[in-house]
Design a protein with these regions (language model features):
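Single conserved hydrophobic/aromatic residue that forms the stacking wall/gate
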Residues: 1-7, 11
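Short strand->helix junction
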Residues: 4-5, 54, 160
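Metal-dependent nucleotidyl/phosphoryl-transfer cores and adjacent nucleic-acid-binding surfaces
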Residues: 8-9, 15, 34-43, 57-64, ...
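Metal-dependent phosphoesterase core characteristic of DEDDh/y 3'-5' exonuclease domains
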Residues: 9, 16-47, 72-182, 188, ...
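Conserved DEDDh/DEDDy metal-dependent 3′-5′ exonuclease domain
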Residues: 44-129, 282-350
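Generic detection of long, well-ordered alpha-helical segments
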Residues: 58, 62, 87, 164-167, ...
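Acidic two-metal-ion nuclease catalytic site recognized across multiple nuclease folds
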Residues: 176-307, 404-461
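Substrate-recognition/cap regions that form aromatic- and gly/pro-loop-enriched pockets
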Residues: 312-418
Length: 461
């Protein structure tokens, strides 16, 4: 079964389907704005939602996430799909779960797998042109935006990005791919689990996959060399290149060659749902067709039979890692940014359910059991948002000042800040005045008033 999702700071939408993508159940909830959170102004406008509407919701963010997690547990094992979900929604969900004292990797462990319909749509159109209809931008490239693709492909989904429309549209695109490009759909089923994906890449003599950059999908017929020493991603040789000169190169020369364009070694991120096709698909493209299957196989065997080359490539990558470590910024990460800095321990993971099950007045005792300081911080931050009177004055002030520092920052941060939001409001106001859109201007005024109140409250911290 599949679960298709979309998420933000104030809503969570998920639809459960069977293997034929027919809906079985759904989760659709909207919550109050959490203290110190500024949603993107444009996201609120697209959703026709104002801060005053969100203030009226009875559900807090913490309660919404609790309901959501319980729903996923009830649904059981599933494949989680979305549109650009692996790069965006999944990362957003992981960080949200991490900060809500839930296990962050719920969608890719315990028999669950994940896939991305955006990368699938690009692969389908590359190998089976016109599987999906796209609008074209001024550079002549296909546009892969859900709100534009859905109507072009006859998908009825209500208003894209509103209510649950974007989730329904994603399922509609998935259905079209499964019908019109079934081989791409079948291939995608084999790489939704990262371990299965890695096994497939290592086992095949050669395979065809695609990458998307500068607005276009490009095919690559490749063979596995070795895994990246730090990230474990498969490093593969692009077989349009003759491997002979590279196999003999001393390490210094190979290091220099690996920095040049075009790249002869490519990274396949096996944990991000690559679409691995039969190498015969490469014959659709001149750069591989002209070389021919026989020669491509010979080149693949040369790589596979040369362990010394694999060791050299691995060594070059290890040197790159050391170099990066030395030049790495020494700036401290905020707790909220530290999800990948280190994994939470098994012991701490076992304490998380206890935090959720006890009454609010007992949660501080549970927080003190966490060994990981980040989890202690998140626990206290949840109390700050839900039951601030339980916190000591000192703990309240630490979190209050921390939120204030983040919100008032004038740096280019990974989160929304007050100065950035004012700037976005000014830009949007000029746009909507020009387009004569009073409804949108009204929401904008509401957002502006909300941000002014936030600024007053946190400026005194």
């Amino acid at each position: 079964q599949f679960a298709s999702s979309a998420a933000s700071d104030v809503y969570k939408r998920q639809v459960l389907t069977n293997d034929n993508l027919d809906e079985l159940d759904r989760f659709d909830a909207r919550c109050r704005l959490s203290p110190g959170i500024i949603p993107e102004a444009m996201a609120l406008i697209v959703n026709k939602t104002s801060p005053s509407m969100l203030k009226k919701s009875n559900l807090s963010h913490y309660e919404m996430i609790r309901q959501f997690v319980e729903t996923l547990k009830r649904w059981g094992k599933a494949t989680y799909i979305g549109f650009n979900s692996i790069e965006f929604d999944e990362e957003f969900l992981r960080c949200t779960l991490f900060q809500t004292l839930e296990y962050p990797y719920i969608t890719s462990t315990n028999g669950n797998t994940r896939g991305d319909i955006l990368s699938l749509a690009r692969a389908a159109n590359l190998y089976y042109p016109n599987t999906l209809k796209n609008s074209v931008n001024e550079k002549g490239n296909d546009v892969y935006k859900l709100d534009q693709m859905a109507p072009l492909n006859g998908i009825e989904h209500g208003d894209a990005h509103s209510a649950i429309g974007d989730v329904i549209a994603t399922i509609g695109i998935a259905k079209l791919i499964s019908k019109k490009a079934p081989n791409v759909w079948k291939a995608s089923m084999l790489t939704m689990d990262k371990n299965q994906s890695l096994e497939l890449i290592k086992k095949e003599l050669l395979f065809c996959t695609n990458e998307y950059f500068y607005g276009r999908s490009r095919p690559y017929v490749q063979t596995f060399i070795c895994q990246h020493p730090q990230y474990q991603w498969p490093l593969c040789f692009d077989l349009r290149h003759d491997p002979s000169p590279y196999l003999k190169m001393p390490i210094k020369e190979l290091t220099a060659a690996m920095k040049k364009q075009p790249k002869f070694i490519r990274t396949v991120r096996h944990n991000k749902h690559p679409v691995i096709m039969n190498p015969s698909y490469g014959n659709q493209f001149d750069e591989y067709k002209l070389i021919g299957t026989k020669k491509l196989e010979e080149r693949a065997k040369m790589i596979k039979n040369n362990e010394a080359f694999a060791e050299k490539v691995s060594s070059v990558k290890r040197s790159e890692i050391d170099e990066k470590e030395q030049t790495k910024s020494q700036e401290d990460l905020y707790n909220e940014e530290s999800i990948y800095a280190k994994f939470t321990s098994t012991e701490d993971n076992k304490i998380m359910p206890e935090f959720h099950s006890v009454d609010w007045n007992k949660k501080l005792q549970v927080i003190s059991k966490f060994k990981d300081e980040r989890l202690q911080y998140f626990g206290k931050k949840l109390l700050y948002m839900e039951k601030p009177e339980i916190l000591t004055k000192s703990d309240f002030n630490i979190i209050h000042k921390d939120i204030s520092k983040k919100l008032l920052s004038t740096n280019n941060e990974n989160w929304n800040t007050i100065p950035r939001t004012y700037s976005e409001i000014d830009t949007l106001r000029a746009k909507f005045e020009k387009e004569n859109q009073p409804e949108k201007l009204k929401i904008l005024d509401d957002i502006n008033a909300y941000v002014e109140d936030l600024e007053k409250y946190y400026s005194s911290a």
